[in-house]
From Swiss-Prot:
Protein name in the entry: Histone-binding protein RBBP4
WD repeats: 32-125, 126-175, 176-223, 225-270, 271-314, 315-371, 372-404
Keyword Transferase among record annotations: no
Cellular-component GO terms for this entry: CAF-1 complex; chromosome, telomeric region; ESC/E(Z) complex; nucleus; NuRD complex
Subunit structure: Binds directly to histone H4, probably via helix 1 of the histone fold, a region that is not accessible when histone H4 is in chromatin. Forms a large corepressor complex that contains ncor1, sin3a and possibly sin3b, histone deacetylases hdac2, hdac1, rbbp4 and possibly rbbp7.
Function: Core histone-binding subunit that may target chromatin assembly factors, chromatin remodeling factors and histone deacetylases to their histone substrates in a manner that is regulated by nucleosomal DNA. Component of several complexes which regulate chromatin metabolism.
Family recorded in the similarity comment: Belongs to the WD repeat RBAP46/RBAP48/MSI1 family.
One GO term (biological process): DNA replication-dependent chromatin assembly
Positions of disulphide bridges: none
Keyword Cell cycle annotated: yes
Species annotation: Xenopus tropicalis
């Protein structure tokens, strides 16, 4: 009986998801300046824009690249580099180019040829997360289903993978007992990599001091303050010795690598009422950071007074797995997770007056809801070169590259707009 009910619930949910998607698709021309939808061969659990951009002469597009991975059933997995053509601001297109069948537009009726897989490198098991090293973006670290963290220099691998399926990382980083997701390169100290794991620990490696012969590098330091799965870890963006970590013990911890006590953080705070899955430091304000949780909220923190949560962003209907500040705007951050939504928030709007109708759509600081995914969003990344462009990937193989309509973030058009979920008001 319970099975029947579960099947019925699933069918109802699927119908709701499909209906919502239809409404979203119908409204994309009003909500977006760009939407590209691409079905990957396998779902990617990870997405990160590389920092470089090519602007070919005489063309109305620029070429950007992404680091992706695969999560296959039983087939060979790969670390993937893809290229994406984004239209220039002056590219000629209008709403008549909109392809209502696919819910895509932006001068590209369809995306064929606009998103291409450039490099595939054999990987051991799915790629839980992949992140490039800021000082040398050819170097990419990956989290595997085993306890090892792998490092690849993608310039040293053929663009087509060896059919044998053999995985040949340039380095293999040891120190964990279990898999995990959190991964962070120090933006101020080249080669310093942090990793978070299900084994309750955080490992630090320095790959700049690696002997040329050995492929295996042992952790320089192991931090053991958390009492449960460590979900995410992130270096502070300005202070080379500070980093933060979050875990299933519901805590946010701030660490200083100069301290000799690797089992006690400088600060520890009960951040949420459920597991804490992600964190992000603000690139413009050295004291501000955000955390996302299974309690469905994003919390805002000030390092100068962690006892007091600055704000709680509430609108998600399920667990939050990723939070990222915009690289271009001090007050903008985005969050995503199990509810298939990516929410963009604007701190500067906290506490603004709202009409009762607007309040029904969400708090004033909820700037936009990206409703284009029909499955859990695994990861997303703000494009560092094109403001407001985001790439998001979901569990059903879909990758979307999109940019909300300018009138949404440029506030002039506030009358009779479209509510963030895409139902016209």
């Amino acid at each position: 009986m319970a099975d029947k009910e579960a099947a019925f619930d699933d069918a109802v949910e699927e119908r709701v998801i499909n209906e919502e998607y239809k409404i979203w698709k119908k409204n994309t021309p009003f909500l977006y300046d760009l939407v590209m939808t691409h079905a990957l061969e396998w779902p990617s659990l990870t997405a990160q824009w590389l920092p470089d951009v090519t602007r070919p002469d005489g063309k109305d597009f620029s070429i950007h690249r992404l680091v992706l991975g695969t999560h296959t059933s039983d087939e060979q997995n790969h670390l993937v580099i893809a290229s994406v053509q984004l239209p220039n601001d002056d590219a000629q297109f209008d709403a008549s180019h909109y392809d209502s069948e696919k819910g895509e537009f932006g001068g590209f009726g369809s995306v064929s040829g606009k998103i291409e897989i450039e490099i595939k490198i054999n990987h051991e098991g799915e790629v839980n997360r992949a992140r490039y090293m800021p000082q040398n973006p050819c170097i990419i670290a990956t989290k595997t289903p085993s306890s090892d963290v792998l490092v690849f220099d993608y310039t040293k691998h053929p663009s087509k993978p060896d059919p044998s399926g053999e995985c040949n990382p340039d380095l293999r980083l040891r120190g964990h007992q279990k898999e995990g997701y959190g991964l962070s390169w120090n933006p101020n100290l080249s080669g310093n990599l942090l990793s978070a794991s299900d084994d309750h620990t955080i490992c630090l490696w320095d790959i700049s001091a690696v002997p040329k012969e050995g492929k295996v590098v042992d952790a320089k330091t192991i931090f053991t303050g958390h009492t449960a799965v460590v979900e995410d870890v992130s270096w502070h963006l300005l202070h080379e010795s500070l980093f933060g970590s979050v875990a299933d013990d519901q805590k946010l911890m701030i660490w200083d690598t100069r301290s000799n006590n690797t089992s006690k953080p400088s600060h520890s705070v009960d951040a949420h009422t459920a597991e804490v899955n992600c964190l992000s430091f603000n690139p413009y304000s050295e004291f501000i950071l955000a955390t996302g949780s299974a309690d469905k909220t994003v919390a805002l923190w000030d390092l100068r007074n962690l006892k007091l949560k600055l704000h709680s962003f509430e609108s998600h209907k399920d667990e939050i797995f990723q939070v990222q500040w915009s690289p271009h705007n001090e007050t903008i951050l985005a969050s995503s997770g199990t509810d298939r939504r990516l929410n963009v928030w604007d701190l500067s709007k906290i506490g603004e007056e709202q009409s009762p109708e607007d309040a029904e759509d969400g708090p004033p600081e909820l700037l936009f809801i990206h409703g284009g995914h029909t499955a859990k969003i695994s990861d997303f990344s703000w494009n560092p070169n094109e403001p407001w462009v985001i790439c998001s990937v979901s569990e059903d193989n879909i990758m979307q590259v999109w940019q909300m309509a300018e009138n949404i973030y440029n506030d002039e058009d506030t009358e009779g707009g479209v509510d963030p979920e895409g139902q016209s008001s």
